[in-house]
């Protein structure tokens, strides 16, 4: 039986689940502009109140992947995305963006998917522009950057143009919806390994099972007990790990990796310019909480990418490439690559 918007809404208001294949049908209709804005808003709000299930999220993400402009990375060995949902409210500098250059310098291939700021002071796209990089790379150029340098940034509006269909509704609603957690699940390069930060501990188990359904090989989904959508220095971090087809959950703390506990306030910024300054200080090897949190998250990325044996080994590799200048060199190469003359 086909799933219509009306049937879906009826199911939702009765607090009944939409099955994954039904969600695929529904999302295709939404993305093809076959559902009115009023119905889209009602469905999104209803899902939020009911709480989205693993199958519903996986079905929606499947369709977003179908409609995306793909990045074809030839050598997928150690290919990883480092991404967060955002929305944690802490306004830290761009930790995952800094970590991508560190992870690439240590041997991973990073296909980072991101956007401008929505709720933070500086989104990944914003800080990359502040660093002098162009964020307007087309899919072939991103693939070339990953192949040549080991890192590429995929600006969400370029790779998900169909999102314009729901943008007016989301903007007018002004509340979190399923789309806030779909972005990190829809990497256009289909990176088989992923380090994902989420803003809510309840999402750790959900998102790691969604990634399993979507065919990820390895994944770490993390949320600090302080609500940070990264591995946190301020407290323990809840981790959901997918490896070998199995999912497990555990906690890690900064002390596990020889790091001092440090309040998140030490990582806060007020603008992209401040985030840029903190990021460059890290890549220059300036000791402190910012360097520690980048090493911790880059270390986790190196582990999930299969470069490091465990997170601790990854942290050691991350520190090495920060202090020997290789991570800063990767940043410089990437900025130069994005600014080169392009054929029109």
UniProtKB/Swiss-Prot annotation:
The protein's annotated pathway: Amino-acid biosynthesis; L-tryptophan biosynthesis; L-tryptophan from chorismate: step 2/5
Keyword Signal: no
Claim: Magnesium is one of the keywords in the record: yes
SUPFAM superfamilies named among the record's database cross-references: Nucleoside phosphorylase/phosphoribosyltransferase catalytic domain, Nucleoside phosphorylase/phosphoribosyltransferase N-terminal domain
Keywords: Amino-acid biosynthesis, Aromatic amino acid biosynthesis, Glycosyltransferase, Magnesium, Metal-binding, Transferase, Tryptophan biosynthesis
Pfam families registered for this protein in UniProt: Glycos_trans_3N, Glycos_transf_3
UniProt cross-references to InterPro entries, sorted A to Z: Anthranilate_Pribosyl_Tfrase, Glycosyl_Trfase_fam3, Glycosyl_Trfase_fam3_N_dom, Glycosyl_Trfase_fam3_N_dom_sf, Nuc_phospho_transferase
CC cofactor note: Binds 2 magnesium ions per monomer.
Entry EC number(s): 2.4.2.18
Residues at which anthranilate 2 binds: 170
Homology family: Belongs to the anthranilate phosphoribosyltransferase family.
Assembly information from the UniProt record: Homodimer.
Protein name: Anthranilate phosphoribosyltransferase
Species of the source: Xylella fastidiosa (strain Temecula1 / ATCC 700964)
Higher taxonomy: Bacteria, Pseudomonadati, Pseudomonadota, Gammaproteobacteria, Lysobacterales
């Amino acid at each position: 039986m086909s799933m219509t918007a009306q049937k879906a809404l009826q199911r939702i208001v009765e607090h009944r689940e939409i099955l994954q294949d039904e969600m695929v049908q529904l999302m295709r209709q939404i993305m093809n502009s076959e559902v009115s804005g009023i119905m889209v808003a009602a469905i999104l709000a209803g899902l939020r109140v009911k709480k989205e299930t693993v199958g519903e999220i996986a079905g929606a993400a499947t369709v977003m992947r179908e409609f995306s402009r793909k990045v074809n990375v030839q050598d997928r060995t150690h290919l990883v995305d480092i991404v967060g949902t955002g929305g944690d409210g802490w306004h830290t500098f761009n930790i995952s963006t800094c970590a991508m250059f560190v992870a690439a310098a240590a041997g991973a291939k990073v296909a980072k998917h991101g956007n401008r700021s929505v709720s933070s002071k500086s989104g990944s796209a914003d800080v990359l522009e502040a660093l002098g990089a162009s964020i307007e790379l087309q899919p072939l150029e991103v693939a070339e950057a990953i192949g040549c340098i080991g890192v590429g940034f995929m600006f969400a509006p370029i790779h998900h143009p169909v999102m314009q269909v729901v943008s007016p509704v989301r903007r007018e609603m002004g509340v979190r919806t399923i789309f806030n957690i779909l972005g990190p699940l829809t990497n256009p390069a289909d990176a088989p390994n992923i380090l994902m930060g989420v803003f809510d501990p309840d999402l750790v188990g959900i998102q790691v099972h969604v990634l399993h359904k979507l065919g990820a090989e390895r994944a770490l989904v993390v949320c600090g007990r302080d609500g940070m959508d990264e591995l946190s220095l301020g407290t323990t971090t809840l981790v959901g790990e997918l490896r070998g087809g199995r999912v497990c959950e555990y906690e890690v703390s900064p002390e596990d990796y020889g790091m001092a506990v440090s309040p998140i306030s030490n990582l806060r910024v007020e603008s992209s310019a401040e985030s840029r300054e903190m990021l460059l200080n890290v890549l220059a090897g300036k000791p402190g909480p910012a360097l520690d949190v980048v090493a911790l998250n880059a270390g986790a990325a190196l582990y999930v990418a299969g470069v490091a044996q465990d997170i601790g080994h990854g942290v050691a590799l991350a520190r090495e490439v920060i202090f020997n200048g290789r991570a800063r060199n990767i940043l410089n190469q990437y900025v130069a690559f994005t600014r080169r003359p392009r054929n029109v």
